[in-house]
Structure formats: structure tokens, C-alpha cells
Amino acid sequence: MIEIIVPATTANIGPGFDCLGMALNLYNKVLFEEIEDGLQIHGCEERFNNKENLVYTSMIHTFKKVGYTPSTGFKITMDCHIPESRGLGSSAACILAGVIGATELSNSKLNKEEILKIATEIEGHPDNITPALFGGMTVSIQDQTSIHFSKVPIQNNFRIYGLIPNFTLSTKESRAVLPQEVSFQDAVFNVGRTALMLASFMNGDLELLNFSIDDKLHQNYRASLIPEYPSIIEKLNFLDIKGSFLSGAGPAIIVIAGKDNLGLADRIQNRMLELENKWTVKEFNMDTQGALIKRWR
């Protein structure tokens, strides 16, 4: 038996659209067992208990990539804690679990860079896959043939909070509201703030972070899909935070605060009670290891 543990991720991180991501200490755990024949999937909703399951399709895709034909069936047991369609990398976690599981089951000698490439082929973009695989904060971009990435050595002098609503938002829907073109002025706005924000994380300068985490490429457009979004941001700005941003395509929101801002989760939660929808506040730590493999006899 092989268990693959994959962390949640938050992508974009304000102005870093489609290139920045960070792994969080919330996990999906997937156990793979070889059985005589057939497919058994346990631990997830009934609608995912079939051959269209993302873990399974990612596993089969990887088998084909490495030229492996399984001679057994599989039992897949899922223990998923990353909420679906909230912008916290649930699909990236399932894809990586399937790719890594297939790599182990087939005894392939794929390195992490090769796993990254296969998983990104399935996901379509590397900004969630990269931190989920390597841990920490990462910058990743892809061209026609390669994925280029680097881990960012950031200071651990801040707290991370996730505001997770009781409604979902698909990446497809969230992508659809984005413009085909943006102004040169908005592009320059994001380039400068992305560079300054990375320097702020690396230097531990949370005051600069508060200024640089702003964005003009995607958040304003996606805000229209999230009920009461302007009101939420207004409430957060009264709580002495160092910045907030949409997590991936949304609807979850990530808040960055100083280490000395104690009891913030309760104060955010109290503000969220004033809203029409239910929002759950969760404190995170950054996961620094990325996806893990455990073998059980």
C-alpha cells in the first residue's frame, strides 16, 4: 500500500497572477492498494466513485506516459480535507496524488521535475502544482516545452488565515470573467507590486507587504462573482491586517497578519457572522515539504 499526502495551495497571492503559489498545512491523503481486478474508490462523494475520478484519471495518464500496463485492479481510499472549488488547490492535490501514486505503483524512476511536467499537463498551469509538490512559496512559469520554477526563501514572521465560504466557484467560471486584454498601466502596476511583494516576503517587511499585495489583473473582475466581497475587504481592513487576496480563482480569501496580532481568527469570524453567507475562518501555516510518500506493508 502506498499513501500520498498532498498539501493545499493558494495561488496568485495578490499581483502574482498565474505564477505565484504557496503550500498550506491542509492535506488530502490518498491510499493506493493493488487488488485482483476492477476499481474501488472510497472516502469521497458518490459522484466521484467512478473512472472519471481525478485521482484515477491522473494515475492512468501517468501509466501511459511511462509505458506501464497494470496487471491488477486498484483500490483508492481518499481522506480529503481540502475543500473542493474554493481556490485552495483541490484539483492540483488530486492530480499530484494520482501522478505520484502511479509513479510509485509502476516503479518508474521519475524525478520531481518530471512529475511536475506530467501533473501540469493535466492541470493546465503550474502555479498550484509546483508548491503542492515542492512546498513553500514558489514562482513558476511555463513555455511550450518546459516549466521554469524557483522556491522563494521567505521569512516566517507572519500569520496566514483562510476565509472559506459555504459556496463554490469553478475555475472555468472565474476565468470567464477575465478580460482578453489589459491596459499597459495595469500591467506595470502588477509587475512592480509583484517584485516588491516578493522582496517584502523575503525581507520580512510586512509594512511593504501591505502596500504591494494589491492587484489589477484579476481580483477586481472576479470580485463580482463573490457575494459581499467589497464588504468583506472593508471589514478586514479594520482588523490591522497586513494584506488580503483571493486564493487562486476564489472564492476563498487569504489574510496575512503579523505574528503579534493575537486572537485575529476570532475577530475575523465575528465580522463574518454579519454576512449573508457562512464563512469559516481557519489559521494556516506554510507547508515547507510538499507532497509526501508513505509505504505501508
From Swiss-Prot:
**Listed Gene3D superfamilies:** 3.30.230.10, GHMP kinase, C-terminal domain
Q: What's any GO biological process attached to this entry?
A: threonine biosynthetic process
- Entry EC number(s): 2.7.1.39
Tell me the compartments it is located in. Answer: Cytoplasm
**Keyword vocabulary terms for this entry:** Amino-acid biosynthesis, ATP-binding, Cytoplasm, Kinase, Nucleotide-binding, Threonine biosynthesis, Transferase
The reactions it catalyses are: L-homoserine + ATP = O-phospho-L-homoserine + ADP + H(+)
A Gene Ontology cellular component where this protein is annotated is: cytoplasm
| Name of the protein in question | Homoserine kinase
Organism, by scientific name, is Alkaliphilus oremlandii (strain OhILAs)
What broad taxonomic lineage does this protein's source fall under? Bacteria, Bacillati, Bacillota, Clostridia, Peptostreptococcales
Question: What gene is this protein translated from?
Answer: thrB
